[in-house]
């Protein structure tokens, strides 16, 4: 009911687009074959309804577009990842992930990560009538100079490119 009230208020002031955060750090607000339910919603368990489907339906009833907002590379803190257990992307695909300052990130330099993010987006656009996709945190962490991807650079980087240029190309290639 609260969401419907908010959407009614948005409609009344002429808002025509809502960005619904469908993926937070390694968890989602929709039924996914790739990632667990968001712990903040239902402690990582299936909540008995599909929040993304619900918000899309309610937005469309009001002629409001609904875009799925997906956090890309950040996966969460050590504590968040530990709570997700075996269902976390870190547990399932450790080689795709890097840790920096107590936070986990998908490694933009690993080609499998591009495929994984493409699969997440594909899952959303094939299952839901979203009006758009918003990719968030499509960048290296703030302290990127310390990002531990030297092994990825050696494996997938080009000798003709600097680390900086290679990283730029990784982000561009994902977008």
Language-model region placement:
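Active-site and adjacent substrate-binding regions of carbohydrate-active enzymes
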Residues: 116-133, 141, 159-160
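Catalytic domains of carbohydrate-active enzymes, especially glycoside hydrolases
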Residues: 2-28, 127-132
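Aromatic-lined substrate-binding rim segments of carbohydrate-active enzymes
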Residues: 6-7, 24-71, 157, 162-175
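Active-site-adjacent "subsite" loops/lids of carbohydrate-active enzymes
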Residues: 1, 54-57, 67-127
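Conserved, mostly hydrophobic/aromatic
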Residues: 10, 18, 59, 66, ...
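Active-site-proximal beta-strand/loop segments in catalytic clefts of secreted hydrolases
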Residues: 21-23, 69-73, 109, 135-138
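A non-catalytic, amphipathic alpha-helix used as a structural packing/dimerization or gating element
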Residues: 5, 13, 112, 116-119, ...
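Aromatic- and acidic-residue-enriched segments that line the glycan-binding/catalytic groove
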Residues: 30-43, 74-101, 138-165
């Amino acid at each position: 009911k609260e969401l419907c009230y908010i959407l009614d208020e948005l409609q009344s002031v002429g808002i025509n687009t809502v960005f619904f955060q469908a993926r937070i750090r390694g968890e989602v607000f929709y039924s996914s074959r790739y990632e667990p339910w968001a712990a903040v919603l239902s402690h990582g368990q299936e909540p008995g309804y599909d929040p993304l489907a619900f918000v899309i339906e309610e937005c469309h009833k009001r002629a409001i577009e609904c875009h799925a907002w997906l956090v890309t590379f950040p996966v969460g803190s050590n504590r968040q990842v530990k709570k997700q257990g075996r269902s976390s992307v870190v547990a399932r695909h450790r080689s795709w992930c890097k840790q920096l300052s107590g936070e986990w990130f998908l490694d933009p330099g690993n080609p499998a990560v591009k495929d994984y993010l493409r699969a997440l987006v594909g899952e959303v656009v094939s299952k839901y009538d979203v009006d758009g996709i918003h990719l968030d945190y499509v960048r290296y962490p703030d302290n990127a100079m310390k990002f531990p991807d030297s092994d990825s650079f050696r494996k997938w980087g080009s000798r003709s490119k600097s680390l900086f240029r290679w990283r730029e190309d990784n982000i561009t290639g994902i977008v």
